[in-house]
Regions:
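N-terminal transmembrane-helix/juxtamembrane module of multi-pass inner/ER membrane proteins
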Residues: 1-63, 109-114, 118
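Membrane-embedded alpha-helical segments of multi-pass membrane proteins
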Residues: 18, 54-61, 134-138, 185-189
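Aromatic-anchored segments of alpha-helical transmembrane domains
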Residues: 21-26, 88-97, 164-174
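Membrane-interface loops
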Residues: 27-41, 70-157, 206-214
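Short hydrophobic alpha-helices at membrane interfaces in multi-pass membrane enzymes
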Residues: 154-167
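Hydrophobic, membrane-inserted alpha-helices
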Residues: 61-65, 140-145, 164-172
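Hydrophobic transmembrane alpha-helices
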Residues: 143-148, 191-199
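Interfacial helix-loop-helix junctions of multi-pass membrane proteins
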Residues: 106-109, 126-131, 168-196
């Protein structure tokens, strides 16, 4: 076991991500004084229960990307974990220092599978700590890291499919009334920033490694 861990040190990133997940869980139950995030644009966005499908697909897309990288591309996995960890750590800090919530979630009454799924999401995902949107942040940053890094960078069709799915996931946060437009914008901006930072740091580290091995 110790020998396997020494050859697969990238797995240690999982410990940090698990710790952050636990920290996020704690922030959901602190009972802090929440600041309402509500833009005029939010009232113009319709409630579209069918988009709950894409909201739920996030729970498969994010671990799916990381599992593939963990098993097939260790360097990509380390980049994923670094980007996720840096941004999520900042998010947790924001959730503690400036806790937020939304006040426009509908009752989702009625029949039908999509409304039932919305009620299920509402029951298990409280509308607190919404800014920035982790749903948008994690989906977009994983897309940027995974599909702008070899070997998947050359898979144009797969990269396009991933982009479309991430776009739909981000839109779903608005259309199922889980987030404000402000949350989406902040989450996506943070994803771009985290991707740029990790790309720079890993490129610098690789350049230093190449220089020292010459």
């Amino acid at each position: 076991m110790r020998s396997w861990l020494s050859k697969n040190r990238h797995v240690y990133w999982l410990l940090g991500l698990i710790a952050l997940a636990l920290a996020y869980f704690v922030t959901q139950h602190l009972g802090l004084r929440y600041h309402v995030v509500h833009l005029p644009l939010d009232d113009r966005i319709p409630f579209c229960p069918v988009f709950v499908v894409f909201y739920i697909l996030w729970y498969f897309y994010v671990p799916g990307c990381m599992l593939w990288a963990c098993l097939r591309a260790k360097d990509v996995f380390c980049r994923q974990a670094a980007a996720l960890f840096s941004g999520a750590l900042l998010c947790v800090a924001v959730f503690v220092l400036y806790p937020t919530c939304i006040d426009f979630r509908p009752a989702a009454d009625g029949t039908g599978v999509f409304l039932a799924l919305c009620r299920l999401i509402y029951a298990h995902d409280a509308p607190v700590n919404v800014f920035p949107s982790l749903h948008c942040y994690e989906a977009l940053v994983l897309h940027l890291v995974t599909f702008r890094t070899p070997p998947l960078r050359a898979r144009k069709a797969l990269r396009l499919a991933s982009f479309v799915l991430v776009l739909l996931i981000c839109l779903s946060t608005l259309l199922v009334k889980q987030h404000s437009a402000a949350d989406l914008i902040a989450g996506c901006a943070l994803a771009v920033a985290a991707h740029s930072l990790t790309t720079y740091l890993f490129s610098k580290r690789r350049s230093h490694h190449d220089h020292t091995t010459v």
